[in-house]
Curated annotation (Swiss-Prot):
Endpoints of the signal sequence: 1-23
Protein name (record): Protein RhiC
Keyword Signal: yes
Organism: Rhizobium leguminosarum bv. viciae
Function: May be involved in plant-microbe interaction.
Example of a GO cellular component annotation carried by this entry: periplasmic space
Compartments reported by the entry: Periplasm
Upper taxonomic lineage: Bacteria, Pseudomonadati, Pseudomonadota, Alphaproteobacteria, Hyphomicrobiales
Keywords tagged on the record: Periplasm, Plasmid, Signal
Length: 149
């Protein structure tokens, strides 16, 4: 019985150590995002892939840029939806890096109301940003209608 209790004690101590280590790692990762300076100027572009024939560049698609499939936190707010942005950016210098699979996009001016927008460059896209803290419904409403690329 003593051996069983001792083994259980070691197992419990190990489990607590792993739990604390995971919490600390998650906190450090979040600090990296929290410490990033938000983008508050320029345009924000959300790419979208639409089926059917592609229209003339810049013309309305009749569709919206839907955020409903993006991951959300327990409160129902986005956790880092992909968009393109850059401080003081415009359509011409912010679109580069937007994946070719997107044949349309929505574009609004920063800041995005009730959201957090931070630069999160990727090797293939220097203009990549994370949009979070806003509900998918609000994001879809703010980004409005898409235009053909």
């Amino acid at each position: 019985m003593t051996a069983t209790l001792r083994a259980f004690g070691w197992l419990a101590a190990f489990a607590l150590t792993v739990t604390f280590a995971q919490g600390a790692a998650a906190e450090e990762q979040q600090k990296g995002k929290v410490g990033a300076k938000p983008v508050e100027t320029g345009v924000v572009i959300r790419g979208v892939t639409l089926a059917g024939p592609v229209g003339n560049p810049g013309t309305s698609t009749g569709k919206t840029c839907d955020f409903s499939g993006e991951p959300v936190d327990p409160s129902g707010r986005l956790e880092g939806a992909s968009v393109n942005c850059r401080p003081n950016g415009n359509q011409a210098n912010t679109t580069p890096g937007l994946p070719a699979r997107f044949n349309a996009y929505c574009m609004i001016n920063a800041p995005v109301k009730s959201a957090r927008l931070i630069q999160a460059a990727r090797p293939e896209n220097a203009n990549h940003c994370d949009l979070s803290g806003i509900t998918p419904k609000d994001a879809t409403g703010q980004f409005g209608g898409a235009v053909w690329r």
